[in-house]
Structure formats: C-alpha cells, structure tokens
Amino acid sequence: IMKWLPGASEGTVVAGGNGKGNALNQFGSTISRFYVNSSKDIYVLDHNQYRVMKWASGANSGTVVAGGNGSGSALNQLNSPNGIHIDSSNNVYVLDKGNHRVVKWAVGGSTGTVVAGGNGSGSNNNQLFNPASFYIDSSENIYISDTGNYRVMKWATGASEGTVVAGGNGNGGALNQINEGSDHIQINSNG
C-alpha cells in the first residue's frame, strides 16, 4: 500500500511492498479493502491469507488481528473474507462471506465472536447466504447486503437474528425486490 502526498512525484510504501507471501511484511494477494484509523494505523484485509493485518503507523511489518489460521469455519479462521470495519475502540469486524457470517474480533483477541449469521447458508432471519458487503452505524447496528437472498438485513447489537429492511422477495425489478448483482450498501444520515 502506497501513500502519495499532494503534489509528490512518488509515493511511500506504508504497508507490504515485500512481494507476495504470508510473512508479516507481505500480503498474499491484491489488496482490495483496507481502513485507516485516526492514529494512522492501517488495517488490511489479506483475502488469500484469510486474515486481517494491522500496520501501526511507521511499522515495517504488520500483526494479525483477525484470522490468520488458514481457511475454515472455526472462530479463529476466516473463509473468503470480503469486508472489514474498525469501530472507535479498534475492534475488527469481518464480513466472512464463505461462512455466511459477520465476526467481531476484540482488540487482542485470538478468536472472534459471531455477531450476524453463522448458522449456515439459508434464508431464515438468523442466516445469511453469500453476503457481499456490510455497514455498521454509530449504534453498532449491522446492515448486510445478503445477495444470495436478494435482501438487506439489519442486525441490532446482541440480536440472535436480523430483520429484513429491503428486498427479500426474490430477484427482480419490483418495488419490493432487489436485482441480482446488488452487492454494495450505503446508509444515509436518516438510517
């Protein structure tokens, strides 16, 4: 990951830059999702290494803060991670697409806690099916683009199941449906 200052003719490597691999100073694939907190720490979703890494500002290598134990369904593993969110306490939320769940990793934790889904793939309100993206609001409600079910789900903090807030009536163009391929979500200030 490169940082480019305005007007600069070249950038500075701030994370990675040591070839492809699984060492703590490498990434296993092209990086598509990362997050920078107010302390300038960089959280990187390393999809092919099934991990989220934190690179402290100015560090030469990262630390694994979620996953990193190969692909799988145990609470210390991820399977096709597809999104990250870092809250104000630096807890890491991972959209674990292959396990049809969202997992929260507390700072310093070695395992995550399922906060949405995690009951196999399906269409019940306690399940997700190929979730594609998510958004977490200031009250820690989780909104999930549940693309396999053509719906958007809202999971309140501590809830064992979500509620459908959009779609959920199959693929299509009717006012109560979501089209296939609707895989991004954004919530405005009105919720």
Question: What is each model feature region?
Answer:
Residues N25-G28, A74, N79, D87, ...:
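Intrinsically disordered, low-complexity repeat regions of secreted/extracellular protein precursors
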Residues I1-M2, Y50-K54, H100-K104, Y150-K154:
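A short loop-to-beta-strand structural motif that recurs across blades of beta-propeller domains
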Residues L5, D46, A56, D96, ...:
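Structural recognition of the beta-propeller blade-terminating site
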Residues V36-S39, I86-S89, I136-S139, I187-N190:
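Residue-level detector of Asp-centered blade-edge/turn motifs that repeat once per structural unit
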Residues N91, S123, Y135-N141, T147:
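Surface-exposed interaction/gating patches
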Residues G7-S32, G58-S80, G108-A132, G158-Q186:
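Gly/Pro-rich loop segments of beta-rich domains
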Residues D41-Y43, V92-Y93, I142-Y143:
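Conserved beta-propeller blade signature
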